Amino acid sequence: MRDWGKESEYLHSTRRHLWNNDYFEFLVKCVWKIDKPVKIIDFGCGYGYLAQLFLPIIPKGSTYKGIDISEQLIENAKEIFHDNSEMVSFEVADLNDYKPTAEYDVVICQAVLRHLPNSVQILKKMIDTAKDGGLVICTEPSRRLENAGVYIDSTDFYPFENDDYLEQKWIKEIKSGGRDYQIGIKLPIVMERLGLKNIGVRINDYVDYVRSEDKDEISRFLSDHDVDSEFSDSNGFVAARCHVISYGNK
C-alpha cells in the first residue's frame, strides 16, 4: 500500500486544488444543512485538510476527530491544529482495526475508499459510526472521470491515450481483489444498498487552469495530474478532478 506519510508535499498541493471554499461552505450550510453543533469524524484524514475547511464555517461547539494510519501525517495535523485542541483531535489507527468509542453526527472521508481493496466494508464501518439520522459523506474521484477531465493545449496531446491502460489495470485489480477505481461513481448505489436514506450526489467545482507563462504552476500541474514533462511547453493546461460527493442519512 502507498505510504502517504512520505507524500505530504503531493497531498498538500493536490488538496489546495480540489475545492473552492465558497462551494464547500454552500454544501455545509445549504445542502447538508449543518446549522447546529455537530461531532465530525474523518476517516483517512491525512494532515487534516477537511478540518481546515470545516472549522471556519461549522457552528460553535462542534468538534472534529481525524483518523489516519500514517503517524507522520497525524503529527503534521497536530502541528497545524495545535491551537485548536478543544475542537480538534487526531488518532493514528488503521481503518480496518479502528473501533470508534462514540457515535458521530457527521462521518466523512475524502479520496480514501479508492485506495482500499475493501472499500465497501470501510463504508459499512462509517455508517455504523454515525448516529441514527447522522450524515455519511464520501468524496471520491472516479479514475475514468479524472482521466477524461484533463486537457493540454498541444498538438501532441491525445486525450484517450490512457484509456486502454486504465481498463486493463482496473480489470486486473478487480479480479485480484484489489481496489476499485470506479468506487467514486458507484457510491450512491452502494450507499442505498447499505440502507442510507435521502441519498444525494454532487460534484466538486474546482477546475485547475494554468496559463503557459506560469512556469512554477506548470511544474506543479504536471506533478499533481501525473502528466509527462514533455508537455511542459504547451500553451495551456486544464484539469477537472471530478470528485463525486455522495451522502446520505443513517
Question: What label would you give each PLM region?
Answer:
Residues 137-210:
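Conserved catalytic/acceptor-binding region of the Class I
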Residues 47-97:
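Class I SAM-dependent methyltransferase SAM/SAH-binding core
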Residues 106-120:
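A short SAM/SAH-binding and catalytic strip from SAM-dependent methyltransferases
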Residues 43:
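Conserved beta-strand/loop positions that form the S-adenosyl-L-methionine
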Residues 180-185, 200-249:
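Conserved Class I S-adenosyl-L-methionine
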Residues 120-132:
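A short glycine-rich, Lys/Arg-flanked "PGG" loop and its adjoining helix->strand segment in the class I
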Residues 1-38, 49-53, 57, 73:
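Conserved class I S-adenosyl-L-methionine
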